[in-house]
Regions:
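Mature, structured domains of secreted/extracytosolic soluble proteins
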Residues: 1-182
Length: 182
């Protein structure tokens, strides 16, 4: 198990904002670049990254309980005082803002398509948010709901540099160590 979170995702009632493989690849690519610049061989297996790192970063995307699009309040980033969305605490204890963006249609405000905006509250003192839009919402497995994040503009962990630094700080396992345990 890469993160030791299988039980949470399979058994508990949760909402999972699923990052795409592409966003994970981008973050790991930066980690590989930094790791290589430090004189180390490239990471060839995701299991070389400690489970504690995967757990910390995957926890950013998991909320306790089930929240479908209809359960989430409106957010308007241009009128945040009126439509702020809602702050939730992730499985890992971080504050995240979640809101539904109501699009405009034919010049009429808020009657168009709706899209969930999942935002990491980077600095709560200045309301600094790192946003991730949902591409597909309300996938409902047996124990919760999954919202898949857009791949084009999201980095795993909301900041791939911080992910890379955390992985380096925790230590990268040698590939030979991983192969012995498999």
């Amino acid at each position: 198990p890469i993160s030791n979170m299988e039980e949470v995702l399979e058994e508990e009632n949760v909402t999972f904002f699923a990052p795409t493989n592409w966003s994970i690849r981008k973050s790991v690519a930066l980690l590989n670049k930094m790791w290589y610049q430090m004189g180390n061989d490239s990471i060839k297996n995701l299991k070389q990254i400690k489970p504690s790192v995967w757990r910390e970063y995957l926890s950013m995307y998991i909320l306790k309980d089930k929240y479908t699009l209809k359960d989430i309040p409106q957010i308007d980033t241009t009128a945040i005082a009126a439509y702020p969305g809602q702050t939730f605490i992730t499985y890992g204890g971080l504050p995240m803002n979640v809101g539904v963006v109501y699009g405009d249609a034919n010049g009429v405000k808020y009657v168009g398509p709706r899209q969930i905006l999942y935002s990491y509250i980077y600095d709560i003192t200045v309301s600094d948010l790192k946003n991730a839009y949902v591409a597909t919402s309300d996938i409902q497995p047996k124990n919760g709901v999954v919202h898949v994040l857009r791949m084009t503009d999201h980095d795993f962990g909301f900041d791939r540099r911080l992910f890379a630094l955390k992985a380096i700080e925790e230590g990268i396992d040698e590939l030979s160590q991983i192969n012995k345990t498999e």
